[in-house]
Amino acid sequence: HVISEKPVTLSLNELDSVIKVADECGKLFTVHQNRRFDVDYLMMKQVYASGVLGDVFGVESRYQGSRGIPGDWRGHKEHGGGMLYDWGIHLIDQMLGIVYDRKIESIFCRLEHITNDEVDDGFKLDLYFEGGLDARIEVGTSHFISLPRFYMTGRRGTAEVNDWRDRTRIVTCREWHEDDVKPVVTSAGLTKTMAPRDEKTVDESWLDRPESDGHDFYRNFTRAMDGKEPQLVSHEQMRRDLEIIEAAFESDKQGRIIPFDDCHFGK
């Protein structure tokens, strides 16, 4: 039985060949998707599934730092370097775990080369889901001020995790109509459109951080070895993540949106 380091392989064809051998030998093969146990991710997954925000139309997931790529394999293309392989594979897997009930229609990706010409040291990846939901996955290594770790918007509210160590802030709309909107005064004039809402029309709440144990990944794998439960990260899920990685590279290469023939990820 084998647990591979992420991203698992550097191509879908290579992954398929490994899966074929594993099946022929009757052995388990999976990838170490330890970020499925990140608490910030688990909170946003809970918010989406609860429906508290109404029909969700936007999800943003980011990791940003300011130290560039570490001076090891991550800087070399032949060894699977670059942030899309290193962090992208985790954040893609998380996004598909959050938006579990929609198909991807197309994707667009732009890679960044701020400090490294050989591999990407950052990227912006947009996943366009059916029903008008747009998801942005972004990683940067030259950012000295970070944007929120997670940001989710729906027709009835917004949820935010500012930092991976924080709780989730949720603001929902209690009453859409306001009788008297107080305009914001700027140096260039007044605006009511972007004026903050009256506290009487919104509710604010906080979702506490749940308990999580990354060792559950290994506990699952040992039980799967004994035939007691299916492995947590399935072959289908590994293929799906890598399909998106390959499509992202192709999108950046061609400079255009790539249509994506998709299937449901599975809740």
What are these regions (language model features)?
Residues H1-R36, G51:
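Beta-strand-loop-alpha-helix segment that lines the small-molecule cofactor/substrate pocket
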Residues I3, L28-T30, E60, F108, ...:
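Structural detector of well-ordered beta-strand residues that form the stable sheet scaffold
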Residues I89, N116, E138-S146:
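Glycine-rich phosphate/pyrophosphate-binding beta-alpha loops
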Residues R239-D252:
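C-terminal hydrophobic helical "lid"/dimerization subdomain
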Residues D16-V18, M44, A247-A248:
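Aromatic/hydrophobic pocket-lining residues that form π-stacking "cages" and hydrophobic walls in ligand
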